[in-house]
Each structure stands twice: as C-alpha cells, then as structure tokens.
Curated annotation (Swiss-Prot):
Pfam families: Thiolase_C, Thiolase_N. Pathway: Lipid metabolism; fatty acid beta-oxidation. SUPFAM superfamilies: Thiolase-like (SSF53901). Heterotetramer of two alpha chains (FadJ) and two beta chains (FadI). It comes from Shewanella pealeana (strain ATCC 700345 / ANG-SQ1). GO terms for cellular component: cytosol. The active site is at C99, H392, C422. One of its GO terms (molecular function) is acetyl-CoA C-acyltransferase activity. This is 3-ketoacyl-CoA thiolase.
Length: 436
C-alpha cells in the first residue's frame, strides 16, 4: 500500500480551495462583545458567498465548528445554512476538534468531494469568548431537576433547603482539560521547563509575531481575506485585528509577571494568545467544477494528517507528530516546503515544536524515524506573524492558517505550504497545500 495520499475525486480532480475569508479577530469583550459565534459564522459565510458571486443555493454541504458551544444552538452549521440564504436542503453538520476544529471541517468537506458525493461545500469555524454558556453548580442543577418533579410546596421547600449560597453562584466554562485538570497555560509552562525554553526566547518570538503582523496589515496584504465586520446595533465596525501590538518593543515584554507559575514560570500574557472572538470559512470545490464556474483557486489540498498523543505530558506537541505524517503522505520533506504556518498558541509551545522538528532523538524515540523532521528555516516560518499577534478564536484558527498561507504563496508565485496546529486533548493537525 502506497504512503502517498490521493486527495482527488474519482475523476482525478484535485480539491480546490476557491477562496477563504475571516472576520477581524478581537480580544474578549471588545469589538465583538455580545456577538455570538453563530452570528459571526453567519456574518463571514454571507460575505464569503457575496464575494464569490456564487448562488448560495449551489452550496451542497456546510461543515462548521465551534469549541465553546452554546446549548441554545448546538448545531451551528445548520443554523448558518438557515440564516444565509442557502437551500434549506443543504446538508450541514457541526464538528469540534479543539483548536484544530476548522482543519477538521475542511477535511470533512474535502472528503465528501473526494468520494463524489458533492462538488461544492463550505467549511470553517467560529468561537466567542465574550458570549459564553454560563452554567450552574452541580448541586443547583440537581435541585432544578428535582424541582421540576416536585408535586407539593413542602417538597419544593425541602429541595431549596439543601442549597447553600455558594451553590447559587454561576459557573463559567472550564478552562482546564477535563482529563488532567491542567489549563493550556499550565501545559505551556510544563513544556517550557521540559525543553529548557527561556523567557527571553519566548518574548522574542512574541515580539517577532506582533512586528510581522503589523507590517502585514500596513502593507495591505490581508485585505482580500479579512472582511469589515459591522457589529449590532450597526453603529460601529471592526476592520482590523485588535490584539496586535503595533508598537511592539522587545524590552516591554520583560515587565510582565508569569501568569501560570508565579515563582518560577516564564509564560506570560504577552507571550501567549489572548481569549479571542472571530470566525473564518473556506469555499471548496472539485477542480473541475471550479474551472467550469470560472474560478481561479487560491490553492489545492495536497495532503493532511491528524494525530493524538498522551495528555499528561507536553500535550501541545501536535505539529511535531502531524507534520511528518502529512509530509510523508505528500511525498515531501520539510525542506521542500515554500512556507510554514504553525499555530502559535503560546511562544513556549511553538518553540518546543520547532526544537523537536530538528531533533533526531525525538524522531527516533517518538516518531520511529531515522532522521529529524528538519530544521525550520525562519525565512519560511510564520512570515506574516502568527496567532500570538492575530489572536486565537479556537475553531476559526485552522481556516485562517490555510487561507493565509495560500494567499502568501500566491504573492510569491506559487509553491507548497504547511499549516499545522496543536490542540487540546493532545491532538495535532497538519495540512499541506499547493498553489500555482
């Protein structure tokens, strides 16, 4: 059996990324305060369709993701279909793979095209850290169920007497891993210690990310892939990511205290991604349908891979496991790539993965390879800045990475690019795209 992955349909047509779009990304409780992930998802899909000048009823499938899900609308994909003028018979379902969610939605639509079930689909993801499912304590939840069954006033009073004042307090969404109790920041701190990553190196990477993102915006490179978002009640709009430190100075990073290990830590708010609101989407077609409709795709999917590792130790190493698998399936080596886009959840996590890309010992012990994945050429790496600057709406990041690398490859005359990310639960994702 060949190791090569055939990302084509039965007619031998490649999977075309026709276009991609995102909202600006905004820090929690700023420009998108009060705007749900669903509303942002509808916003970006509507605009994607408008820019493509494609009849919404031509969309055969929409797969969309959300990490912080709202109980009122658990199938965000279907609600987007119903809210954007698509045919009501359009297939739609939702996925979640933590920070790799929109990698998953993209692959799901691609695989539907590969099997011949459809020719046109939309994938993406959205998350809001400003509109959250605030819950109740387990004791209060239990009592509320019992109250619904109570038949008399005496029974109701008996149930209320079981509750204390602390049981009535609202419960925000958990920030820790369910299985380990560790937050992502604590895991990043763990990785900084495991791989001896200094505070200075973390701060330097964050400064690089913000500096490059500022230059990218100022050069007008993101105009095609970031929409202007008009926010209810439509008296204001946002047209640029608002997390970027446009006057980033390296020396200012050293002033912040560690956020997760106050005494001995090195992970700070400045070298981590903030809680972010935003949405993104890509329009996918079979190569034949794209050409028949007159589109020039921004790229094609060459290969992809998903991996999983243990969650108890350094679980944000996903890129180091998924990337070599995606490269193998594409018949490539790291040095063959024109560009590399790696999700920067934390500077520590990013630097740990970069270090392991070049480690022969890691390759032998963890990957069963006789050579390292390869040393990363920084002239190819996150050349427009990364998540540390742009922000990280969990489910939206994957399609941001894919769209961004495709557009940059276009500007450079084509080539191949890697988009890769770690994700909670020890998950990893990688996708290789080719651009003509």
């Amino acid at each position: 059996m060949s190791d090569r992955q055939q990302v084509t349909n039965a007619r031998g047509e490649r999977i075309a990324i026709v276009s991609g779009l995102r909202t600006p990304f905004a820090k929690q409780a700023t420009a998108f305060h009060g705007v749900s992930a669903l509303d942002m998802g509808k916003m970006v899909v509507n605009e994607l369709l408008a820019r493509s000048e494609l009849d919404p009823k031509e969309i055969e499938q929409l797969v969309y993701g959300q990490v912080v899900q709202m109980p009122a609308a658990p199938n965000i994909a279907r609600e987007i279909v119903l809210g954007t003028g698509m045919n009501v018979s359009t297939d739609a379902y939702s996925v979640t793979r933590a920070c790799a969610t929109s990698f998953q939605s993209t692959v799901n639509v691609a695989e539907s095209i590969m099997t011949g079930n459809l020719d046109i689909g939309i994938a993406g993801g959205a998350d809001s850290s400003s509109v959250l499912p605030i819950g109740v304590s387990k004791k209060l939840a239990h009592a509320l169920v019992d109250l619904n069954k109570a038949r008399s006033l005496g029974q109701r009073l008996s149930i209320f007497r079981r509750l204390g004042l602390k049981d009535l307090l609202p419960v925000p969404p958990a920030v820790a891993e369910y299985s380990t109790g560790l937050s992502m920041g604590q895991t990043a701190e763990q990785m900084a210690k495991t791989y001896n990553i200094s505070r200075a190196d973390q701060d330097a990477l964050a400064h690089r990310s913000h500096t490059l993102a500022t230059e990218t915006w100022n050069a007008g490179k993101l105009a095609e892939e970031v929409m202007v978002a008009h926010v209810p009640p439509y008296k204001a709009f946002i047209d640029r990511d608002n997390n970027i430190r446009e006057n980033s100075k390296l020396e200012s990073y050293a002033k912040l205290r560690p956020a997760f290990d106050r005494k001995h830590g090195s992970v700070t708010a400045a070298n981590s991604t903030p809680l972010t609101d935003g949405a993104s989407a890509v329009l996918l077609m079979s190569e034949g349908r794209a050409k028949a409709l007159g589109y020039t795709p921004i790229g094609y999917i060459k290969s992809y891979a998903f991996t999983a590792i243990d969650v108890w130790e350094d679980m944000l190493m996903g890129p180091s496991y998924a990337t070599p698998l995606a490269l193998k399936r594409a018949g490539m080596e790291l040095e063959d790539l024109t560009l590399i886009e790696m999700h920067e959840a934390f500077a520590a996590q990013t630097l740990a993965n970069m270090q392991m890309f070049g480690s022969k010992k890691f390759a032998e012990e963890k990957l069963g390879r006789n050579r390292a994945i390869g040393e990363i050429d920084m002239s190819k790496f996150n050349v427009l800045g990364g998540s540390l600057a742009y922000g990280h709406p969990f489910a939206a990041t994957g399609t941001r990475l894919v769209t961004q690398v495709c557009h940059e490859l276009k500007r450079r005359g084509g080539g191949t690019g890697l988009a890769t990310a770690c994700a909670a639960g020890g998950l990893g994702a990688a996708m290789i795209v080719e651009v003509e």
